[in-house]
Structure formats: structure tokens, C-alpha cells
From Swiss-Prot:
CDD domains in UniProt: KOW_RPL14 (cd06088)
Function field: Component of the large ribosomal subunit. The ribosome is a large ribonucleoprotein complex responsible for the synthesis of proteins in the cell.
PANTHER family registered for this protein in UniProt: 60S RIBOSOMAL PROTEIN L14 (PTHR11127), LARGE RIBOSOMAL SUBUNIT PROTEIN EL14 (PTHR11127:SF2)
Protein family according to the UniProt entry: Belongs to the eukaryotic ribosomal protein eL14 family.
BP GO terms, sorted: ribosomal large subunit biogenesis; translation
An annotated GO cellular component: cytosolic large ribosomal subunit
Protein name: Large ribosomal subunit protein eL14
Highest taxon above the source species: Eukaryota
One family name in Pfam for this protein: KOW
Gene Ontology molecular function, alphabetical: RNA binding; structural constituent of ribosome
């Protein structure tokens, strides 16, 4: 379904680029087919200014105002509908808030965040591994369990035991031959 957030007076928009990036404003008036007049009296840097439509993202929230209304009327309309609070609670706003908080944090706060993430990952992994030992859910544990079950069936016959012992003896012989070759090579140097 197509988003029907049409450009009109009263529509909330988010600025995409520039010094006011990720700030929210309200369309006060439409200048022409490419530009609109945007303002947000509740925010300090969002005084009335012209924005290109390529630089704004229309949001689903809208307030009922007349075109080119006063700042006072716009502020009253925003406060009565509480659209800024509704927008702040949306999923779209969450990453912007997190990014802003991270940018404003100090070096030590970022360090604390990294340590907390590591700790959380360690404990989550530890709990998962403990539970995985009791009741395997990870694919490699389940596959290993199946393999061991099938191996027990195959290894129980006397012929299989003989083959396993023969393979072990051959491996030991190879290792011994490899060690003797390295000793000979070392003595030639």
C-alpha cells in the first residue's frame, strides 16, 4: 500500500540533511512545487524557514492549521494534539534518539556502554551454553548428538571395533614416521 502522507499545511516532516538533520517541523505554507515553509516553535533551531521537498520526509502526523498561520497558533495546535509526544514514542524516532544520546555522551560513558555490552553478551552466551548442554537446541549440538547415536550403532559390531583399532594404529605409525623424518631433516642441517 502506498503511503498517503501528502504535503499540506499542518503535516509534520522530518529534515533529512543539513544542520537541522533529524529535527521535526510542521509545514506552515507551500511556497511552490519544490519548496515548503517549515517551523517548529517547540524547538530552538527550527524557526520558520524554507526547505526543499527533497530534503524532508513527511510523517503520518498532522495538525489542523490554516496556511501561513502565526507561531502562537501553531504552538497551540501542537500542544493541543500532542503530536510531538506521539512522534517521540514511535519506532521511527528510537534510532535517532539513540544516535543523539551516543553523540552527546562522554568518552567514559561510551566505554561503560562497551563494557556493559560485553558483559551482557558473556552472560547470555553462558546461560545459553548451560541450557544447550541439558537440552540441545543449537544445530551443531543436535547434529553431534545424532552422529554419536549413529556411531554407537555402527561401533558396537566386532568388525567395526577392529577397523577403528586398525585406523588408530595406522595414525600412530604415520605420526611416528613424521617425527623420525623431522629428526633426520634436523640432523642433516
Amino acid at each position: 500500500m502506498v503511503k498517503a502522507n501528502y504535503i499540506r499545511a499542518g503535516r509534520l516532516v522530518r529534515i533529512l540533511r543539513g544542520p537541522r538533520q533529524n529535527r521535526v517541523g510542521v509545514i506552515v505554507d507551500i511556497v511552490d512545487a519544490n519548496r515548503v515553509l517549515v517551523e517548529n516553535p517547540c524547538e530552538q533551531k527550527m524557526w520558520r524557514h524554507v526547505q526543499n521537498l527533497k530534503n524532508v520526509e513527511p510523517l503520518k502526523f498532522c495538525v489542523s492549521i490554516s496556511r501561513n498561520c502565526s507561531t502562537k497558533a501553531l504552538k497551540e495546535a501542537l500542544e493541543s494534539k500532542k503530536v510531538l509526544e506521539k512522534y517521540a514514542a514511535t519506532k521511527v524516532r528510537r534510532p535517532h534518539r539513540a544516535k543523539k544520546a551516543f553523540a552527546e555522551s562522554t568518552d567514559f560513558e561510551r566505554y561503560q556502554l562497551r563494557v556493559a555490552k560485553r558483559s551482557r553478551a558473556y552472560w547470555a552466551r553462558k546461560i545459553f551454553d548451560e541450557n544447550d548442554k541439558k537440552n540441545p537446541v543449537s544445530w551443531h549440538k543436535v547434529a553431534l548428538k545424532k552422529l554419536l547415536k549413529n556411531a554407537k550403532k555402527v561401533d558396537s559390531t566386532p568388525a567395526a571395533k577392529k577397523r577403528v583399532e586398525k585406523a588408530r594404529a595406522a595414525r600412530k605409525a604415520r605420526l611416528a614416521a613424521g617425527k623420525s623424518k623431522t629428526k633426520v631433516a634436523a640432523s642433516k642441517k
